[in-house]
From Swiss-Prot:
HAMAP family: Thymidylate_kinase. This is Probable thymidylate kinase. SUPFAM superfamilies: P-loop containing nucleoside triphosphate hydrolases (SSF52540). Its EC number is 2.7.4.9. Belongs to the thymidylate kinase family. It is an enzyme of class 2 (transferase). Signal peptide: none annotated. GO terms for biological process: dTDP biosynthetic process; dTTP biosynthetic process; dUDP biosynthetic process. PROSITE patterns: THYMIDYLATE_KINASE. It catalyses: dTMP + ATP = dTDP + ADP. GO terms for cellular component: cytoplasm. ATP binds at G9, I10, D11, G12, C13, G14, K15, T16.
Length: 199
């Protein structure tokens, strides 16, 4: 049975790099949110500075996810799937903007629950250094990233079972570690949770 694994974390934690490496190791389909579809492209424009209501952005993420989930379910028939961001990003990023959790959960009700979530943590100052060369997006401010980091831990520790992955959460701190060190930690933790993930 193929598995659906999600990578989450604040901006600059290294999740895109690690998600790609793990997907390659597991011979999995790599995917990401926002997607590169029409809705995902609109979201990227807004994140780069275009204006819209925060509720509109939340609804766009949810709509993009409808398309994404459809593709994930197709891909799972053939291989494991590894996603760089998923519904958890919507919950913590949009709650950091003051959108009620109930609203976010309702508009994402159809989202498929993954088998495992890998949360990459990092020191906030190191994350900001890693992001220095990138184009800034609306969420890439230290105060917002701090709220988002707290939001992830609040989500993991909540008793709400909505979107609770079958094999739970893996938390890996990437601060002051090489890409290889982090990769090895993640891979070992995944195998520990799902021993038959590598055939």
């Amino acid at each position: 049975m193929n598995k659906f694994i999600v990578f989450e974390g604040i901006d600059g934690c290294g999740k895109t790099t690690q998600a790609k490496l793990i997907a390659e190791k597991l011979n999995a389909k790599f995917t990401f949110e926002p997607t590169d579809g029409k809705i995902g492209k609109s979201i990227r424009e807004i994140l780069s500075g275009s204006k819209c209501q925060k509720e509109t952005l939340a609804l766009l993420f949810a709509a993009d996810r409808v398309e994404h989930v459809s593709k994930i379910e197709e891909d799972l028939k053939k291989s494991h799937v590894v996603s760089d961001r998923y519904v958890y990003s919507s919950i913590v990023y949009q709650m950091s903007q003051g959108i009620p959790k109930d609203f976010i959960y309702t508009i994402n009700d159809y989202a498929k629950t993954p088998d495992l979530v890998v949360l990459l943590d990092v020191d906030l100052n190191e994350a900001l250094k890693r992001m220095e060369s990138r184009e800034k997006e609306i969420f890439e401010k230290i105060e917002i990233q701090k709220k988002i980091k707290e939001g992830y831990y609040s989500l993991i520790n909540s008793e709400n079972e909505k979107f609770m992955p079958k094999y739970g959460f893996i938390i890996i701190d990437t601060t002051s570690k090489s890409i290889t060190q982090v990769f090895d930690e993640i891979l070992n933790a995944i195998i520990d949770k799902i021993p038959d993930i590598i055939q």
